[in-house]
C-alpha cells in the first residue's frame, strides 16, 4: 500500500513539473516583452456603484495601448502585512506605453472614477533594467 502512495506521489510530481515546463515554454514562445508593469492597489471600495463603471471601461483602455492584464482580482491571500482588497497588475511593452496609456483621455477618466470610488494607489514599475 505504501509503495502505491509513493508511486502516485511521484507521478503527480512529474505531471506537475511537465505542465509547468509546458506553460513556461508557451510564455517564451509568445515572445512577449514586458518593459513595465502598472500596479493598482485598492484597499477600500467606497462607492461600489461608481466602481462598477470603472470595471466595464478599463479593459478597452488597457488594450488600446497594448496592455495585458496579468492579475485583476479580489482573491488575495496576505503573506506579510495586510493584503489589499483588490489588486491589478497590467503589463506593457515599455514604460513609455504605460505612461501614454495612463495619460490618455480614457484612462484619465478611469483614474478619476477610481479615485472617487476607492481608497487606492497606482504606480508604474520599470522592468527593462532587471538583470
Go through each PLM region and give its residues.
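Bacterial N-terminal signal peptides that target proteins for export
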Residues: 1-13
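Short S/T/G/P-rich N-terminal loop/turn motif that feeds into the first structured element of a domain
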Residues: 16-86, 91-100, 126-131
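A common structural junction motif
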Residues: 106-112
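A short beta-strand-loop micro-motif that forms or neighbors metal/cofactor-
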Residues: 113-124
Amino acid at each position: 500500500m505504501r509503495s502505491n502512495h509513493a508511486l502516485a506521489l511521484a507521478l503527480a510530481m512529474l505531471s506537475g513539473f511537465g505542465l509547468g515546463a509546458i506553460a513556461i515554454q508557451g510564455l517564451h514562445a509568445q515572445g512577449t516583452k514586458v518593459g513595465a508593469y502598472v500596479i493598482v492597489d485598492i484597499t477600500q471600495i467606497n462607492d461600489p456603484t461608481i466602481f462598477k463603471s470603472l470595471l466595464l471601461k478599463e479593459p478597452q483602455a488597457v488594450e488600446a495601448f497594448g496592455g495585458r492584464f496579468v492579475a485583476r482580482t479580489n482573491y488575495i491571500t496576505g503573506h506579510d502585512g495586510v493584503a489589499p482588497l483588490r489588486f491589478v497588475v497590467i503589463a506593457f511593452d515599455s514604460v513609455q506605453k504605460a505612461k501614454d496609456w495612463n495619460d490618455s483621455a480614457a484612462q484619465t477618466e478611469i483614474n478619476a472614477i477610481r479615485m472617487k470610488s476607492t481608497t487606492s494607489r497606482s504606480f508604474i514599475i520599470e522592468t527593462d533594467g532587471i538583470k
